[in-house]
Amino acid sequence: MKRVSRRAFLRRLGVGVAATAAFSPLAVAQARRYRWRIQTAWDAGTVGYSLFQKFTERVKELTDGQLEVQPFPAGAVVGTFDMFDAVKTGVLDGMNPFTLYWAGRMPVTAFLSSYALGLDRPDQWETWFYSLGGLDIARRAFAEQGLFYVGPVQHDLNIIHSKKPIRRFEDFKGVKLRVPGGMIAEVFAAAGASTVLLPGGEVYPALERGVIDAADFVGPAVNYNLGFHQVAKYIIMGPPETPAIHQPVDLMDFTINLNRWRSLPKPLQERFIAAVHEYSWIHYAGIQKANLEAWPKYRQAGVEVIRLSNEDVRKFRRLAIPIWFKWAKMDKYSREAFASQLEYMKGIGYVTDEELKGLSL
């Protein structure tokens, strides 16, 4: 047998390693670069949009520049409520919406974010998505629409800004109220309010002109950025133990055109998923910090914070629970999502047998 010199062996070994590296998944991903256009629901000039821009920089960093995301604020390419179709048809590669916006066309999205008096803490929603099957339900439902649901993005509780004082449950009767739709709209409608769906950028002028009397839209920091304190001198919240009766965990998400997603090499898919999960908590923490800085500004602007009572919460709860079940029956994904959430709520003592009497899936 012919002997191979040490030098020749090392030379061949180097060639082999180089060849192996050249055909590794990461090297294949490096063979081309990808550029996505993603629009968020956050308006330019808000803390939310600033955080979104930082996320796009982080994606580039985590993918070594192989995936670049061009960020767009709300309305820059298409209207906020047109993002779904824009991503589906490829006008945009992806979106960062408030998930609940699609409840009218995908009822399950009403269960992919918090609803009146259901799960009310960010960690509970993380548990449901990542340990109780929620992420799988979301991805299967969105795949049928030609979309890939990457994951939820933690955000904030929602507060209501009002031009008139609302001091008890009965005061909602006749109020023209902007809400995000879905079950939340039905609960307020059952309480006697007249509900309207508007994107965030249209809330200020609607309040200013008196088109609406009050508006739910995210939390104090972004709402201050949008100038709500200038046109509405009341903020309506629940009691301390239930500060947001209607939407305590207002989740956003990242959704990508399914073909664009499938064209992305798996190593880059994994890094983007990791970036979204990381961003979820960075986004949440950034919003909370900004909220703490915003509250004193409301006081300086003369805005009064009104807290509803525990009795008001009980009245909303009596309206809300039957509406949960109504929405759960709208399609198979809604039923599957709510069934698992209901078991979770039972397990942590959030609902009683008495409250569920006569209701079934």
UniProtKB/Swiss-Prot annotation:
Database matches in InterPro entries: DctP_fam, SBP_TakP-like, TAT_signal, TRAP_DctP_sf, TTHA0766
Q: Which Pfam families match?
A: DctP
| UniProt keyword annotation of Mitochondrion present | no
Signal peptide range = 1-22
Molecular function (GO) terms for this protein are: calcium ion binding; protein homodimerization activity; zinc ion binding
Q: Which UniProt keywords apply?
A: Calcium, Metal-binding, Periplasm, Signal, Transport
The answer to keyword Nuclease applying to this record is no
Identify the residues that bind Ca(2+): 158, 216-217, 247
**A cellular component term, taken from the record's GO annotations:** tripartite ATP-independent periplasmic transporter complex
Its GO biological process annotations read: lactate transport; transmembrane transport
Which amino acids does the record list as binding substrate?
A: 101, 158, 178, 217, 247-250
Q: Where in the cell is it found?
A: Periplasm
Quick one: where is this thing mainly located? periplasm
Give the matching PANTHER family: EXTRACYTOPLASMIC SOLUTE RECEPTOR PROTEIN, PTHR33376
Similarity comment text for this entry: Belongs to the bacterial solute-binding protein 7 family.
Main function: Part of the tripartite ATP-independent periplasmic (TRAP) transport system involved in the uptake of lactate. This protein specifically binds L-lactate.
The UniProt subunit note reads as follows: Homodimer. The complex comprises the extracytoplasmic solute receptor protein TTHA0766, and the two putative transmembrane proteins TTHA0767 and TTHA0768.
This protein's name: Lactate-binding periplasmic protein TTHA0766
Report the source organism: Thermus thermophilus (strain ATCC 27634 / DSM 579 / HB8)
